[in-house]
């Protein structure tokens, strides 16, 4: 039970943040393309890379931080199920090029963002 609480609280914070980002992106760009999911998944991947880099650098493990931020907040903030659904919505609307670009941008963007976060932390002075 000790590990469940930080995950639950972090998940609530992350899900709330995702909702706010989604509302802002929808108001800014409209519903034509799932910019909200693309942005939260890339930003969340960058944050995960930063977190992993910081935890590795600290050498203390930071189990509670990992549970709260990595599993809870970032698990609630990013969303693979929405990514999957939005791909199929684009595809079914006949927007196969946009659907393909969405997959590439999401996967490549998230991988690059996570790696960038880890590299950024490694560049900081000890």
From Swiss-Prot:
Principal localisation: membrane
Topology in the lipid bilayer: Multi-pass membrane protein
Compartments, record wording: Cell inner membrane
GO biological process, one term: cellular detoxification of fluoride
UniProt binding sites for Na(+): 75, 78
Record-annotated membrane-spanning stretches: 35-55, 71-91, 101-121
GO molecular function, one term: metal ion binding
Claim: Transmembrane is one of the keywords in the record: yes
Modes of activity regulation: Na(+) is not transported, but it plays an essential structural role and its presence is essential for fluoride channel function.
InterPro entries in UniProt: FluC
A Pfam cross-reference name: CRCB
GO cellular component terms, semicolon-separated: plasma membrane
Keywords: Cell inner membrane, Cell membrane, Ion channel, Ion transport, Membrane, Metal-binding, Sodium, Transmembrane, Transmembrane helix, Transport
Reaction(s) this enzyme catalyzes, per UniProt: fluoride(in) = fluoride(out)
Family: Belongs to the fluoride channel Fluc/FEX (TC 1.A.43) family.
Purpose: Fluoride-specific ion channel. Important for reducing fluoride concentration in the cell, thus reducing its toxicity.
Protein name per Swiss-Prot or TrEMBL: Fluoride-specific ion channel FluC
Source organism of the structure: Sphingopyxis alaskensis (strain DSM 13593 / LMG 18877 / RB2256)
Gene name of this polypeptide: fluC
């Amino acid at each position: 039970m000790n590990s469940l609480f930080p995950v639950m609280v972090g998940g609530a914070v992350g899900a709330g943040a995702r909702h706010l980002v989604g509302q802002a992106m929808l108001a800014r760009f409209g519903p034509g393309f799932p910019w909200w999911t693309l942005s939260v998944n890339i930003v969340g991947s960058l944050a995960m890379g930063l977190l992993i880099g910081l935890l590795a650098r600290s050498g203390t493990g930071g189990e509670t931080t990992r549970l709260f931020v990595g599993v809870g907040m970032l698990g609630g903030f990013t969303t693979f199920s929405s990514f999957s659904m939005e791909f199929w919505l684009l595809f079914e609307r006949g927007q196969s090029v946009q659907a393909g670009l969405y997959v590439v941008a999401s996967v490549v963007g998230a991988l690059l963002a996570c790696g960038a976060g880890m590299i950024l932390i490694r560049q900081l002075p000890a």
